[in-house]
Amino acid sequence: MLLSVPLLLGLLGLAAAEPAVYFKEQFLDGDDWTNRWVESKHKSDFGKFVLSSGKFYGDQEKDKGLQTSQDARFYALSARFEPFSNKGQTLVVQFTVKHEQNIDCGGGYVKLFPGSLDQKDMHGDSEYNIMFGPDICGPGTKKVHVIFNYKGKNVLINKDIRCKDDEFTHLYTLIVRPDNTYEVKIDNSQVESGSLEDDWDFLPPKKIKDPDAAKPEDWDERAKIDDPTDSKPEDWDKPEHIPDPDAKKPEDWDEEMDGEWEPPVIQNPEYKGEWKPRQIDNPDYKGTWIHPEIDNPEYSPDANIYAYDSFAVLGLDLWQVKSGTIFDNFLITNDEAYAEEFGNETWGVTKASEKQMKDKQDEEQRLKEEEEDKKRKEEEEAEDKEDEDDRDEDEEDEDEKEEDEEDTTPGQTKDEL
């Protein structure tokens, strides 16, 4: 069967538009994830990941992910996929993070490694290609890391991208394009974008200060100068402090015992401070001298800053003080639209019901605490009333005793008489 040229081109176009999905993990097959993910044995006390949807969720099955389960631990877990290079194509890295433990200090990022990584020996110093995701530690660190390894050096972004710091699930997306531009999205909304060359110090600067240039000796940068015609008034100089004219020597002052009496000093009302001549515009002012720049001979453009020869492993290599973070919905692809759609079909579908469940739990907890508080107050009031009743009974007994004593004493006296 022969196909027409337009139809053939259309089919080829559809094939070309098909997204390449290099890695996708949603943990929808129970414990089978343990066959795909490898624990590092570099340290014997790495923390353990467990499969969990957490204390609250939008869908108990769909929201299951890898959860950190031990406090104050390093974690090192990774999954391998078919190696690929992003040369000539877009790279999209996406995943969800939920810090349901209200994290105080810990990482929520991922690392992409080359195929040479020994997964069973993965650790904090293992060389990676890209590190991306949220990192929180106290009030001072709440950022999204975007770190590229360029020629063996880890290069941090020059911008500060703030991460989400609540207890809900959030979608993090990094897009790296072959035109050396990038985009960072949180919850499918752009929070940062720009040029790799501009926002990271991969390359030496294009321009440098001309080493042969120097500011001319007669270059005057003073906008104002002292008025040469101005002079200090003759009566300007007055002492800052003077003896108090109203002070009097105490009548009982004994100079032989107390020494010579000196009046206390006070601020001089006529003191004017240091005299300075008035300022006038400098007729020789030339402005601030700007060091001329020249092309940096060490600068060489690199059209392939974005590109890596090998991506083959996604790893969770992080530290957490308080455990409970859940990682889910991992995706590595070359298609921005597909990643956005995948985010909407996963995080986007369950986010509202997740919040509803959390709100319901919070309300139930609030009511429980109110009931417990009410019960505690009632018990305290009952105890107070019981103590008060006991005191009243004691007082009544004391009164009766006193009355009996008063009645008995006169009778005894009469009998004795």
Curated annotation (Swiss-Prot):
Q: Where is this region: Disordered?
A: 193-277, 350-417
User: What GO cellular component is one of the record's annotations?
Assistant: midbody
- Region (4 X approximate repeats) spans which residues? 191-255
Check the UniProt entry and state the signal peptide residues, or none. 1-17
Q: For the modification N6-(2-hydroxyisobutyryl)lysine, which residues carry it?
A: K64
Example of a GO biological process term:
protein stabilization
Q: Where is the composition biased (Acidic residues)?
A: 252-261, 380-408
3 X approximate repeats: annotated span: 259-297
Alphabetically, the GO molecular function entries are: calcium ion binding; carbohydrate binding; unfolded protein binding
Which residues fall in a coiled-coil region? none
Q: Which residues carry this modification: N6-acetyllysine?
A: K48, K159, K209
Q: Where is this region: N-domain?
A: 18-197
Where does it mainly reside? endoplasmic reticulum
Q: Known InterPro entries for this protein?
A: Calret/calnex (IPR001580), Calret/calnex_CS (IPR018124), Calreticulin (IPR009169), Calreticulin/calnexin_P_dom_sf (IPR009033), ConA-like_dom_sf (IPR013320)
Domain comment from the record reads as follows: Can be divided into a N-terminal globular domain, a proline-rich P-domain forming an elongated arm-like structure and a C-terminal acidic domain. The P-domain binds one molecule of calcium with high affinity, whereas the acidic C-domain binds multiple calcium ions with low affinity.
Q: Briefly, what is this protein's role?
A: Calcium-binding chaperone that promotes folding, oligomeric assembly and quality control in the endoplasmic reticulum (ER) via the calreticulin/calnexin cycle. This lectin interacts transiently with almost all of the monoglucosylated glycoproteins that are synthesized in the ER. Interacts with the DNA-binding domain of NR3C1 and mediates its nuclear export. Involved in maternal gene expression regulation. May participate in oocyte maturation via the regulation of calcium homeostasis.
Name the record gives this protein: Calreticulin
